[in-house]
Regions:
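Short acidic, glycine-rich surface-loop motifs adjacent to enzyme active sites
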Residues: 1-4
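Conserved beta-sheet core of the metallophosphoesterase superfamily
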Residues: 7-85
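A short C-terminal boundary segment appended to hydrolase-like catalytic domains
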Residues: 60-160
Length: 160
């Protein structure tokens, strides 16, 4: 649940780009990490260190500011484990030189009614990754700036 790429991740990404990769998609920490453009032998490459949790989540609650009971791992209630991004990018190749011409991300969030099922308020578990645009206004207002900050300045957020 590390919100920034580790030095080893950056080194691996750099090695992949130096070996000719134009796009490196990393994943694993269950939270968003930055997307950056790197100079490459062919021009420009793109590295997305983590696009968040794209299948499920650990966070039982979505809004920030909840106290974490001592017996729980903080990730269990962290809203960041419900954030994700659908990356959309366009590359252009001109005379063998590569450049990123568009870099956008659709903010995603994971709807998870686990607590409703556990408390008898719902019969079936419903866990879905969906565009943040379909969430409540309060949720969008809280999570959109967090998602934008996590991905970094290179990415423009768009709605789906």
């Amino acid at each position: 649940f590390v919100d920034a790429p580790r030095i080893a991740q950056r080194r691996r990404a750099r090695a992949l780009v130096d070996a000719g990769a134009d796009l490196v998609l990393g994943h694993g920490p269950h939270v968003l990490q930055e997307v950056e453009r790197l100079a490459s032998p062919r021009g420009e490459a793109l590295v997305a260190y983590s696009l968040g949790n794209l299948v499920s989540n650990q966070g039982l609650r979505y809004f920030a500011g909840r106290r974490v009971p001592e017996h729980l791992h903080p990730a269990v209630v962290s809203p960041a484990t419900r954030d994700g991004a659908w990356l959309r990018t366009t590359f252009a190749v001109d005379e063998g030189r590569v450049r990123v011409t568009a870099l956008e991300a659709v903010p995603l969030w994971t709807r998870n009614n686990f607590l409703d099922v556990a408390r008898g308020r719902a019969e079936r578990l419903d866990v879905r990754v969906r565009p943040l645009a379909r969430a409540s206004a309060a949720l969008r207002a809280e999570r959109r700036p967090v998602i934008a900050a996590a991905l970094g300045d290179a990415v423009r957020l768009v709605e789906f």
